[in-house]
Regions:
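Extended intrinsically disordered terminal tails
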Residues: 1-157
Length: 157
């Protein structure tokens, strides 16, 4: 009852609407948080691929200068495999787009991390609000002896 008084809820329908809104808001924030985490993961993976590519590029240039020598390939097989993997990862993550500068990637990662932190704070408060609203609604339903099935039958009458 205290929750209902704090929220100025006097009708059962208001309580139902409040609970539905809280659940909707929570699910929307969950989805935003998931998307932000996915973007952050992709950005970090791309940054790692760029670093690996830059470190192994001189080995590939040496391989090319040696006219794709089998001997050079045998000596530097691991580095060349890492180079190819980094290049493939960048191609896959960029999807044909131009490679952004490392400073831009760092800034994007910083912005995504800040957004994730802000969303997570909002997510926690929305989660608590949802739990409260759903618990109060469940308690009121129990006190009134109303379940979803009984309520539907009453509406059909």
């Amino acid at each position: 009852l205290q929750f209902m008084q704090e929220q100025n809820i006097t009708e059962y329908d208001q309580l139902s609407a409040k609970a539905e809104d809280a659940v909707s808001r929570f699910h929307a924030l969950t989805e935003q948080l998931r998307r932000t985490e996915a973007d952050l993961s992709v950005t970090s993976e791309l940054m790692g691929a760029v670093v690996r590519y830059a470190k192994t590029r001189p080995v590939f240039d040496g391989y090319k200068a040696a006219k794709y020598s089998r001997k050079y390939l045998a000596e530097h097989e691991a580095e060349l495999a890492d180079y190819r993997a980094a290049k493939a990862t960048m191609g896959e993550l960029l999807g044909g787009e131009k490679l952004p500068k490392m400073a831009e990637l760092k800034e994007k990662r910083r912005q995504l991390a800040a957004r994730k932190k802000a969303l997570y704070t909002e997510y926690r408060s929305a989660q608590e609000e949802m739990r409260q609203a759903v618990a109060v609604k469940a308690n009121i339903d129990h006190l009134l002896g109303v379940t979803d099935g009984q309520r539907k039958k009453e509406q059909e009458r």
